[in-house]
Amino acid sequence: MTNVLFIKANGLPAERSVSVALYEIFLTEYKKSHPDDNVTELDLFEADLPYYDVTMMSGLHKEAAGETLSPEEKRLADIANSYLDQFLAADKIVMAFPLWNFSIPAQFLTYLFYLNQAGKTFKYTANGPVGLVADKKIALLNARGGIYSDGPMQSFEMSLNYVKNVLAHFGISEPEMVIVEGHNAKPDQAKDIISAGAKEAVELAKIF
């Protein structure tokens, strides 16, 4: 059975968030097209993730080195590892997220920090880091109200680019993508822009 992890990195309702609307559209179509797959949903805004602080980082480093952890270090390391284990157990992963303030929501950044562990998602070699999860199939559903694919704001796009770089670090270099942009910058075209993205999400979900 194929294990599929759906990750939602936006706490707004679908009627107020294009990335959440894409998530729900993709999820509905995927379940219809792949009825035998095991689907798990992870809402990062409901998960109440503790930030990747010095104590968590210390605990993970000590654990990797075989050293003794304090009770708080162990508690936090266990939380990070539980999310990493869930990610590693998935054959396919769908990530839906917006561009907020040129980047990703803090909850999503924290989650990606949990995943970024040497020996698990990547390893160090004499020639630099090498990803360890290249076999994962990933779909990225991203929405940004402005225009960032080209023009004067292109260099400000640190949402999709950041996530793609993190995944490439893990060995996942060619994720599937649905990108909706410009619906706030061009309100007269918003309905058509969002509709086109929704159709793209449906078609990708069918074959993902």
Curated annotation (Swiss-Prot):
Enzyme class: oxidoreductase
Any GO molecular function: oxidoreductase activity, acting on NAD(P)H as acceptor
Known EC number: 1.6.5.-, 1.7.1.17
Keywords, ordered alphabetically: Flavoprotein, FMN, NAD, Oxidoreductase
InterPro entries: Flavodoxin_fold (IPR003680), Flavoprotein-like_sf (IPR029039), FMN-dep_NADH:Q_OxRdtase_AzoR1 (IPR050104), NADH:quinone_OxRdtase_FMN_depd (IPR023048)
Entry's cofactor comment: Binds 1 FMN per subunit.
A Pfam entry, by short name: Flavodoxin_2
Organism domain of life: Bacteria
Catalytic activity: 2 a quinone + NADH + H(+) = 2 a 1,4-benzosemiquinone + NAD(+); N,N-dimethyl-1,4-phenylenediamine + anthranilate + 2 NAD(+) = 2-(4-dimethylaminophenyl)diazenylbenzoate + 2 NADH + 2 H(+)
Keyword Hydrolase among record annotations: no
Family: Belongs to the azoreductase type 1 family.
Subunit structure: Homodimer.
Protein function: Quinone reductase that provides resistance to thiol-specific stress caused by electrophilic quinones.
Protein name: FMN-dependent NADH:quinone oxidoreductase 1
Organism: Listeria monocytogenes serovar 1/2a (strain ATCC BAA-679 / EGD-e)
